[in-house]
Amino acid sequence: ENAGCWSATGASAEAENQKFTDGQDAGKLTAGLMWQTVKRYSCKYKLESEITSFVALDDNVEVMYVRIHNVAKTDQKITPVAAVPIYGRSADNIRDHRNVTSMLHRICTQQYGITVKPTMSFDEKGHRRNHLIYFVAGAAGCGVKPCSFYPTVEAFVGEGGTFTHPEAVYREKDGMPAGVEIAGKEAMGGIRFEQVTLKPDETMKYVIIMGIAEQEDEVEKLVAKYDSAAKAKQALETVKNYWQEKVNVRYHTGDSRFDLFMRWVSFQPFLRRLYGCSFLPHHDYGRGGRGWRDLWQDCLSLLLMDPGDVRQMVVSNYGGVRIDGTNATIIGSKLGEFIADRNGISRVWMDHAVWPFMTTKLYLDQTGDVEILLEKAKYFKDAQAGRGTDIDDAWTDEYGMWQRTAGGDVYEGTILEHLLVEHLCAFYEVGKHNEMRLRGADWNDALDMAADNGESVAFTCAYAGNLRQLADCLRLMQDKIACTEIELLEEISILLEDNTKRYEDIAAKQALLKKYTSTCRHDISGKKIQVSFDSLIENLTHKADWIMEHIRRTEWPQGQDNEGWFNSYYDNHENAVEGISEQGVRMMLTGQVFAIMSGTATDEQIGQICKSADHYLYDAAVGGYRLNTDFCELKFDMGRMFGFAYGEKENGAVFSHMTVMYANALYKRGFVK
C-alpha cells in the first residue's frame, strides 16, 4: 500500500525498465518434469514471490501455486491481482479476423473467476457452433474467493494502458462482482483478492487455475479440485511422482550435467505426444501438430520408457500407409487416426517409408515378436493417387478413408505387406541417375526445390539397408513360425519382378511402377497370392545388393590424400550436388551416414569418409560435425536451405540427431575405438 505496484512474475513495464541494472529483481528458475518454480526477490518492495506452475494429470488445467513472502522488517499491506489474458480461439485468428472473432465472446464472472464461451468458430471451411469454455479462476490459499474481477482487456488495461502497465492496477480501480455478463470483447482473466496485511516473514498463498472445459458444471468441478493451497500442493506432488516414474530412463556417463540433460531429452517425446511439435502458436512450426516421422520416432523412444502400448501403436500407425506406398500427412489426435488432405495433391516426402521399418525393426530386436509382421492393418485412402502425381476422381467422402476392394469391402493386409509396398514402390521410383527421386523433400525438409529432377542418394542407401534387413527379418520369421509361404495382395506381384536388366533400365522401372499404381488407383482386387519365404528373401536381397553396388560404382567423388565420400543428392538440373569443383569441396553428412549405416559403404570407403568429414565438416567451435560445407550459392534448384545463413538450420548447422546417427553408424560398422 502506497509503495507502488510490483509484478511477482516480472511482467511489468517497471521490471522491463530495470533489466540489466542494479535495480533488477533477483530470480531463480527450478524446473522439473511438467512443473517449474520461479522465485523473484524485489529489493525495492521487500517482497519475494515463488510461483510454481504445473499441468494437472487428469484434468485439462494448468495450475499456478503462488507464495508471496514479506521480507521487510515492518508490516506490509498488499492487494494481490492475478491477470491472465483469455484469447479463446484459434491461433490463426492472431492474423485473420482477430477483432471480428472477439465479437463472438460471451464472458461471465463466476464466484471464483471468469469464463469465456465463444458462440462459434469460423474460417474458410465454414461455421461451427462452439462448445468449449475457457476459464481462469483463483482462490486464496485457505480457499477464500476473490473479491472482484476484470473480465475484459478493456476493463483491465484501460485507455492507453498495456498489459505490463494496466490502469486497473495502477489506479486501483474497482473490479466487477460475480454474475456479470459481457459480450463481444477481448477477454481477460483479471482476478482481484482482498487486501491483506503481511507481518515480517509472513507468507500468503494463492492458487490460479487456467483451463478449458465443455460444460459449465465441469468448470465448477475443476475449480473445486484445486481451490486451496493444500489441494494444489497435493496435485503437484502427484504430478512430480507420476512423471518421475513415467520418464524411467536414467543416464550415467560420468558427466552429471549431460545425464540430466538427457533426462529432459527423454521427456520430450511425451511432450510431443501431448502437445504436438510446438508449444508457441505463432513461432516456427506453430500449428503444433505431429507429422508422419513423429509417429514413428516417438515409438522408438517409448520402446525404452513405456513399452506396454508400443505394439498397438506400431500396428495402428501402419494404417496411415496408402496402397501406392505413400502415406497420410495429416495426423489425427486419436491412435491410428489419419485425415484426408482435401486441398489437392499434397507434398510427398521420399524418406517417409524408411522410418516405419526402422521403428518396427527396433521393436523386433527388443521383443523378439516377429509375429507382429503378420498382424493386419488397413490402408489409408483419399483422393491422392499415383504416389502424389494423380487425383482419384472417383473417391468421395462416402467412400471413406480406408482402401476398399472392388467388392466394396475395407481391405486389410499384413504389416509385412505394408512394408513391402512402401519399399518396393520406392525402389522403382527413380530419376535420371537411377537413384530414388527426391520428390517434395527427404528427411531434410529444406531440400524442397528439386521436385522434378532431384534424387536422394542418401535415402536410396537407407532403403537398400532396409531391404536387406527386411530379408533378415523374413529369415528369422521363417525359422520361428515354421511357415514356408506368405500371403500377399495379388497386385504386389507386379512389384516383385526380379530382373537385373529391369533394374538397370530407368524407363522400364518407371513403367512398372506406373502399371502398379494405375492398377491400384481406386479400388484393388482384394485377391491374395502365396509367395514363398525363400523367393521373397532372394528378391529383396537382389534389390538391396543391386542398389548398393550401383551407388558404390557411380556416386563416389574421390578426393586427394585418401579422402572420398558419397554424393548425397542430384539437383533439379540433374547435376550431382557434391564433389570437387571450381567452387571448392562440397560435402554433406547425410549421404555418408546412410551409406555407412546401411552397409553400402565398404570398410575402405568408411575410412576415407571419416577423414573427409573430419577435414571438411568437423568444427570444434560449434560443437561437432556440420551438416554440409558452405556451398556459397543460393541453389534455387535444390532447396530453401541454401537461403539460410551458413551455420543456421539445415545449411551447415550441427544437427544433433544426424551427428548421433553418424556416431551410431560408425559404431555399427566397428569404427569406434
Where are these regions (language model features)?
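Short, mixed-charge aromatic SLiMs
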Residues: 1, 319-328, 380-389, 487-502, ...
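Short, glycine/acidic-rich hinge or "gate" loops at secondary-structure transitions
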Residues: 97, 220-221, 330-331, 370-381, ...
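Long, charged, mostly alpha-helical binding arms that flank functional sites
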Residues: 193, 217, 237-256, 261, ...
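Metal-assisted phosphate- and nucleotidyl-transfer catalytic regions
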Residues: 543-557
